[in-house]
């Protein structure tokens, strides 16, 4: 089982089920479709807590490239402006521009990673 930590700004959206995806940097092992995932906030602190019980199941893991001039390439296809907006909203941002600023600041651009989607068992 793979564990993911989330910044506080995303916690309410995850807990109410509005955010059911995450964009992540490459790592040794990501969750795989069909696997249970554990979602936490505050890991490695006294404020650590699990966000969803029972554990959600991974639906998909898709390769992603984010570029400041071209947008997002998902599974070898560049997203339209409308699709960028939908992806940003689903990921917990108010708009595509906010999502782009966040990744530019936190990770730098261009950014290569994965889009992970899950389903809750509520």
Which stretches of residues belong to each language-model region?
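Catalytic phosphate/metal-binding cores of nucleic-acid and nucleotide-processing enzymes, i.e., regions
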Residues: 1-122
């Amino acid at each position: 089982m793979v564990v993911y930590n989330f910044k506080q700004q995303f916690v309410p959206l995850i807990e109410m089920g509005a955010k059911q995806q995450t964009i992540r940097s490459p790592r040794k092992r990501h969750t795989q479709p069909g696997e249970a995932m554990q979602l936490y906030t505050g890991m490695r602190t006294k404020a650590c807590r699990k966000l969803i019980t029972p554990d959600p199941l991974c639906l998909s893991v898709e390769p992603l490239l984010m570029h400041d001039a071209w947008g997002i390439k998902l599974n070898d296809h560049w997203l339209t402006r409308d699709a960028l907006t939908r992806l940003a909203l689903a990921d917990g941002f108010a708009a595509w521009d906010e999502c782009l600023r966040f990744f530019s600041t936190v990770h730098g651009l261009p950014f290569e990673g994965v889009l992970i989607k899950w389903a809750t068992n509520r």
